[in-house]
Amino acid sequence: MKFNSDMLKIYFVAGTQDVANKADFLPKVEEILQAGATAFQLREKGYNSIDNPAELTELAEKCHQLTQKYHVPLFIDDDVDLALAIHAEGIHVGQKDEKIESVLKRVQGSMIVGLSCNTEAQVKQANQLDGIDYLGTGTVFETTSKADAGAALGVAKLQELVELSHYPIVAIGGITLDNLPQTMATGVKGFAAISMFTQMTAVPTQMQKIKAIVKG
């Protein structure tokens, strides 16, 4: 699957640790995909996540079946071996994960590559690299979904990074329906979220509101 920045519009990120009952995870993923998510990232990380390799591979394969059903890319967070093993469409790399240069060498253009960049220095460094497709930038607003999220950037700083970047940016961190319009106004290509999706009720209605803002 070739990268298209439209993939970043409604970017769902989650792992089993993000739902109260692990049995609800795959149904929730399908519900959000069916309602119009444009990408899904399996981020199985932190307290109460799956650490058994066989179980994780099985979960990733099931997620891939769902993303293929709805014709959207599956990204694997910080696990090149897993991404390659299941032929995921993409890999997302954080600043504290495996070095991006190593990841690019390993995937050799076989998948979409996203990199977390949250400072001017990180964006400038990314601008010097070939093989990256997009940057994930945040946290834009305060969030409790990611323990390592750091201080919030705010929309003014986000816009500065968007203007600095050679690559399309997807915003993440504390994004809600209320602050989504100002987030999109910075020039980002889309937004990513965890709890906004995993805790969503009345999914079709909420997703229609999101689509209206993102396409605005």
Swiss-Prot record:
Positions annotated to bind Mg(2+): D78, D97
Gene3D superfamilies, A to Z: Aldolase class I
Cofactor(s) essential for the protein: Mg(2+)
One example of a Gene Ontology biological process annotation: thiamine diphosphate biosynthetic process
SUPFAM superfamilies with a match to the protein in the record: Thiamin phosphate synthase
GO cellular component: cytoplasm
Cofactor binding: number and manner: Binds 1 Mg(2+) ion per subunit.
Protein name: Thiamine-phosphate synthase
Provenance organism: Pediococcus pentosaceus (strain ATCC 25745 / CCUG 21536 / LMG 10740 / 183-1w)
Name of the gene encoding the protein in the UniProt record: thiE
